[in-house]
Amino acid sequence: MNHKKDLYVLGIETSCDETAAAIVKNGTDIISNVVASQIESHKRFGGVVPEIASRHHVEQITIVLEEAFAQADMTFDDIDAIAVTEGPGLVGALLIGVNAAKALSFARGIPLVGVHHIAGHIYANRLVQDIQFPAIALVVSGGHTELVYMKEHGSFEVIGETLDDAAGEAYDKVARTMGLPYPGGPHIDKLAQKGEANVPLPRAWLEEGSYHFSFSGLKSAVINTLHNASQKGETIAPEDLSASFQESVIDVLVTKTERAAEAYGVKQVLLAGGVAANKGLRAALEKTFSSRPEIELLIPPLSLCTDNAAMIAAAGTVAFEKGIRGKYDMNGQPGLDLTSY
């Protein structure tokens, strides 16, 4: 009888402002997962400063790697492959992780696999439950808002994407206008839970049948609403404005996801990306798909929504099993395309 050997993959993630390392077994089981966040260092600047991010990655990369192995009680002799975020992201930040992965791969003779950051977010779902195909992933983060159709493992077709601001980017810009701290998304989400969506704001549906998104008009509408109220000496409750803004964003995201899921006849809808931690979005998706028993909704736990290396190891496992290998001329690719990955 054939017994398949367990596959242990070391994941490394440094695409933005988290330095992370993890070890995952067979693409589904987290053995260790270590994340060093830099949020406090970037808060006073109101956003991620690339130079600061890169410096922190240099300081933290060895520490998180050592901790990942310590938590797993494993050594490099136990590792079958090293998966690293190749892109997209901040080029200086990416280079820290990529160079660390290449050095370890070369020194230890362990195969190297480059991973697309968004593929990682999608495969965070596989760390919770196996993915059934065909599936559609709603990817919502600070830099990306996409609907991705998957007919099998490692197959990605972007059927809808933002034409301007990503949803997470719109959240941060609106939060800054409202005087809320960075990162703005969680603050708006928290305020929205206490408010009423009574401020009229637009929803960008675009042309009929389109799965694309646009949030720049909504962002401008919020800014204009605040400016007009100020000119008249009026105040708008931040809870109500947050609830109204969030409802406009979520309405479009959920409606287009449901339409796409129906049109493509999928078995599962996967939520992915940092904004997947948003309580309002999670609740709206759960409510919508609770009445669609033929479509299963997968939502990762909060710890796997934001950037982490376990998701990179999970996606890297799929690539490794398909025979994909990275070369030592691998570089950080800030504009890496998901469909060509």
Curated annotation (Swiss-Prot):
Keywords, sorted A to Z: Acyltransferase, Cytoplasm, Iron, Metal-binding, Transferase, tRNA processing
GO terms, molecular function: iron ion binding; N(6)-L-threonylcarbamoyladenine synthase activity
Location of this chain's protein in the cell: Cytoplasm
Required co-factors: Fe(2+)
EC number(s) reported in the record: 2.3.1.234
Primary location: cytoplasm
Entry binding sites for Fe cation: 117, 121, 307
Cofactor descriptive note: Binds 1 Fe(2+) ion per subunit.
SUPFAM superfamilies per the UniProt record, alphabetical: Actin-like ATPase domain (SSF53067)
GO cellular component: cytoplasm
TM region(s), chain numbering: none
Binding site for substrate: 139-143, 172, 185, 189, 278
Organism domain of life: Bacteria
Any Pfam family: TsaD
GO process terms (BP): tRNA threonylcarbamoyladenosine modification
Reaction(s) catalysed (UniProt annotation): L-threonylcarbamoyladenylate + adenosine(37) in tRNA = N(6)-L-threonylcarbamoyladenosine(37) in tRNA + AMP + H(+)
Entry function: Required for the formation of a threonylcarbamoyl group on adenosine at position 37 (t(6)A37) in tRNAs that read codons beginning with adenine. Is involved in the transfer of the threonylcarbamoyl moiety of threonylcarbamoyl-AMP (TC-AMP) to the N6 group of A37, together with TsaE and TsaB. TsaD likely plays a direct catalytic role in this reaction.
NCBIfam families: gcp_kae1 (TIGR00329), T6A_TsaD_YgjD (TIGR03723)
Protein family per UniProt: Belongs to the KAE1 / TsaD family.
Protein name: tRNA N6-adenosine threonylcarbamoyltransferase
Lineage: Bacteria, Bacillati, Bacillota, Bacilli, Bacillales
